[in-house]
Amino acid sequence: MKKSILGLSVAALLFTGCSENQKKQKESSQVDNVAAEADIPETPSKPEESKTMYPDLSTYIESVVADMDAIPKERKDQLKKIALFVQTKKQSNEPANLTFICTHNSRRSHMSQIWAATAAAYYGIEDGINTYSGGTEATAFNPRAVAAIKRAGFKVKNPGGENPRYKVSYAEGAPQMECFSKKYDDPGNANENFVAVMTCSEADKNCPFIPGASLRVPIPYVDPKESDGTDQETATYDERCKQIATEMFYIMSQVKA
């Protein structure tokens, strides 16, 4: 957030307005959490008309689905809020827009966007579900995170440049996802009636109000960046990729087609 240079009274006013908006988003989140507990089934649904994924990705997804039961209940409660948002939008024939947000839009938010779209296709519910990602600032989709999704089985085309617009696909003939770093309010992202999914605690703390969001759900992940340049780099990125994949698949498994 930009610091006010107009004095303490203006700063206080801005803070008050932000707090009120933040309260509204939190209250909306709490209401949806109660509804999620009542309306979302515990048993994940089976894919009805899943897309034929690339072979290596399909094998990877089998292990992802097998891991869903191990997600802690507290975490599932948060994920169900997102599932209910998607379910409600689909039942109303409205687009279900999911925007995944972290500080630099370089690792966790991209993985979340990609895996959410892939999970929706796997369960045959992708129509009307739109996934986006953004940061509080723009950098680039980190090459280490790109390498992790490639190891999972995605096909990725890199056009080059300082902030490449990667083309990511999960199946032949499926729409390619264009992934590049941008701010969460980029013109290409949804600007209203979306769920703001906060994938890092720093962005959740520093940006307490997301304009246009009808729901805000924090599901922070540990930043794999902490392993950059170490012997644990590949293992850490793969672990985070698998965790995010498992939770995105859990979300979509809770949505009835």
How would you describe each model-predicted region?
Residues A11-A12:
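Repetitive helical segments and hydrophobic/amphipathic motifs
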Residues K2-L8:
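Sec-dependent signal peptide recognition
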Residues K26-E49:
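Post-signal peptide N-terminal segment of mature Sec-exported envelope proteins
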Residues F15-G17:
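C-terminal motif of bacterial Sec signal peptides marking the signal peptidase cleavage site
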Residues K26-S29, S50-A257:
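Short polar/charged helix/loop
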Residues S19-N21:
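Bacterial signal peptide processing site
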